[in-house]
């Protein structure tokens, strides 16, 4: 999504700091340590700032339910199970995925500073928000960052009709002379949160996103939520590369779940269930160990400019680079406020009443 500043009457704008404080209020009231609450809030707000509504504050109810059901451990003892100069294996002790992920990527960056590369695999965690958050942590330190996570089964494999794969996102960030390059994508056609957005709006989804329980392509959100499945990146069958998205999803499960000794998507549970056992994978690559950082940034910018200045299709205004829309949307929303769908605002204020904190005023 790229926002130029206009939103319709179904949205209200809320300043970033106000929304951040609200999330922290809710989480700390429920017993989350303030430092951890700020990490979770930062992750959610970054999603909304970048236009990723599916992973923004609309997800807060899921985390509140996870806390109240015992699915999220507010005081995890995050353990290093194995460690070497350039790698580590962590057990997240069912903590907030955002908190576990933040600490894991920090560790990967620290190791990359010393050895050139840092790899951290994580098991026994929870949903960690947007994958790009962690990849950008490395890019901001002048490194290449890679982040991925498995998730509960929502996607049918190519040729199947059963939910057996996760949406299993992948992110890679790299510094340039300007804003970082940021690829942040699900390995399904869309993440499940996109369907939740359409459900709230009462709209049909685009054709090609999902199938119903019989394996038929559907535009009905309810058919998807009632036994249907999302499709892997590339869509239905092999003609447009659905088997490639399927393969990328398995790659995430191998690096996140199987390598860590955790589990793969078929056996991952929802956030409000105990032992959801979400698994992550983080990598930081210290560019200076391979080539001078400024030279790398220059070459990145040169490549990007060549692509953006190449001949454009008449149906498109411009050629975008991954992450560019998100940074431009962030600039707009930092100035004007974050647009929140009114139904989401009602849900957030219901959460506030439920836990006993001040709600959001517009």
UniProtKB/Swiss-Prot annotation:
Localization terms from the record: Cytoplasm
Reaction it catalyzes: (S)-malate + NAD(+) = oxaloacetate + NADH + H(+)
MF GO annotations: L-malate dehydrogenase (NAD+) activity
InterPro entries xrefs: Mal/L-sulf/L-lact_DH-like_ah (IPR043144), Mal/L-sulf/L-lact_DH-like_NADP (IPR043143), Mal/L-sulfo/L-lacto_DH-like_sf (IPR036111), Malate/L-lactate_DH-like (IPR003767)
Keywords: Cytoplasm, NAD, Oxidoreductase, Tricarboxylic acid cycle
Domain of life of the organism encoding this protein: Archaea
UniProt feature coiled coil, ranges: none
E.C. number(s) listed in UniProt: 1.1.1.37
Cellular component terms (Gene Ontology): cytoplasm
Chief location bin: cytoplasm
Pfam families associated with the record: Ldh_2
One GO BP: tricarboxylic acid cycle
Subunit structure: Homodimer.
Family statement drawn from the similarity comment of this UniProt entry: Belongs to the LDH2/MDH2 oxidoreductase family.
Name this polypeptide is given: Malate dehydrogenase
Species for this entry: Pyrococcus abyssi (strain GE5 / Orsay)
Lineage: Archaea, Methanobacteriati, Methanobacteriota, Thermococci, Thermococcales
């Amino acid at each position: 999504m790229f926002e130029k500043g206009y939103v319709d009457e179904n949205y209200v704008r809320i300043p970033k700091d106000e929304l951040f404080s609200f999330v922290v209020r809710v989480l700390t009231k429920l017993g989350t340590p303030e430092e951890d609450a700020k990490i979770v809030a930062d992750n959610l707000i970054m999603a909304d700032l970048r236009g990723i509504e599916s992973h923004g504050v609309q997800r807060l109810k899921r985390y509140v339910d996870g806390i109240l059901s015992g699915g999220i451990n507010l005081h995890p003892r995050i353990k290093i199970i194995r460690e070497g100069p350039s790698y580590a294996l962590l057990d997240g002790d069912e903590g907030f995925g955002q908190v576990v992920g933040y600490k894991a990527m920090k560790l990967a960056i620290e190791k990359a500073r010393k050895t050139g590369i840092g790899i951290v695999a994580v098991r026994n965690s929870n949903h960690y928000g947007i994958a790009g958050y962690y990849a950008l942590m490395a890019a901001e330190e002048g490194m290449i960052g890679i982040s991925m996570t498995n998730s509960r089964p929502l996607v049918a494999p190519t040729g199947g009709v059963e939910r057996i794969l996760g949406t299993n996102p992948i992110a890679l960030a790299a510094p340039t002379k300007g804003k970082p390059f940021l690829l942040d994508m699900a390995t399904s056609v869309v993440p499940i949160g996109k369907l939740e957005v359409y459900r709230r709006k009462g709209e049909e989804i685009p054709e090609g996103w999902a199938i119903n329980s019989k394996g038929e392509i559907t535009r009905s959100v309810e058919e998807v939520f009632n036994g249907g499945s999302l499709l892997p990146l590339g869509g239905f069958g092999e003609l447009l590369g659905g088997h490639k998205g399927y393969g990328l999803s398995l790659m995430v499960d191998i690096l996140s779940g199987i390598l860590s000794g955790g589990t793969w998507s078929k056996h991952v549970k929802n956030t409000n269930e105990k032992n959801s056992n979400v698994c992550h994978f983080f990598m930081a690559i210290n560019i200076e160990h391979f080539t001078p950082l400024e030279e790398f940034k220059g070459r990145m910018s040169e490549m990007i400019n060549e692509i953006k200045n190449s001949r454009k299709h008449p149906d498109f205004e411009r050629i975008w680079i991954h992450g560019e829309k998100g940074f431009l949307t962030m600039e707009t929303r930092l100035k004007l406020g974050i647009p929140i769908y009114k139904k989401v605002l009602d849900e957030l204020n219901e959460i506030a009443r439920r836990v006993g904190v001040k709600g959001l005023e517009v």
